[in-house]
């Protein structure tokens, strides 16, 4: 968090003073502004050091700083951490198993996670990548309302991978 110059540490000769209510009090000597702040039992805080003259505000600095820290903490808490979930299919997947895994993918997408869909090939199945593409295309078609394909199907060793991301909901 940024530190501000306060009270006696302000070195400018004159400052533009903003009162605790946000109203402009005008340009005055720093000593005069400091005396005014002390009369109100508040701090003089240099908030605009690069302005001409610098801008100082009369406020309760420790209270303001605490509120800023709490707001920062709350923002970090609300920042969504997206995870990449992984679902694996086999080439010869049964319809019920497919629907179950599709349900898992839907739930992950609704929670805002990305989903890596993997088709695992065994033995000679690797000679028929079109079977894996068919399953991935079906998944894409079944989830077209919930997801967008972030990474198209691609072979990696004995696996074919595709990455789905949740559709952004426009509010």
UniProtKB/Swiss-Prot annotation:
Source organism, top-level taxon: Bacteria
Biological process per Gene Ontology, one example term: ribosome disassembly
Location, primary (coarse class): cytoplasm
Coiled coil (residue ranges): none
HAMAP family: IF_3 (MF_00080)
Function description: IF-3 binds to the 30S ribosomal subunit and shifts the equilibrium between 70S ribosomes and their 50S and 30S subunits in favor of the free subunits, thus enhancing the availability of 30S subunits on which protein synthesis initiation begins.
Family: Belongs to the IF-3 family.
Entry protein name: Translation initiation factor IF-3
Name of the coding gene: infC
């Amino acid at each position: 968090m940024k530190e501000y110059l306060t009270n006696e540490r302000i070195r400018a000769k004159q400052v533009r003073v903003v009162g605790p209510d946000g109203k402009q009090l005008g340009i005055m000597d720093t000593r005069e502004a400091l005396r005014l702040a002390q009369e109100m039992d508040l701090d003089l805080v240099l908030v605009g050091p690069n302005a001409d003259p610098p801008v100082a505000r009369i406020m309760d600095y420790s209270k303001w700083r605490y509120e800023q820290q709490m707001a920062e903490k709350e923002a970090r808490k609300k920042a969504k951490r997206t995870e990449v979930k992984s679902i694996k299919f086999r080439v010869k997947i049964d319809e019920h198993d497919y629907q179950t895994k599709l349900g898992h993918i839907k739930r992950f997408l609704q929670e805002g996670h990305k989903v890596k869909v993997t088709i695992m090939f065994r033995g000679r199945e690797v000679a028929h990548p079109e079977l894996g593409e068919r399953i991935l295309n079906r998944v894409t078609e079944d989830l077209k309302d919930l997801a967008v394909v972030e990474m198209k199907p691609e072979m990696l060793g004995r696996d074919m991978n595709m990455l789905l991301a949740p559709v952004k909901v426009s509010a």
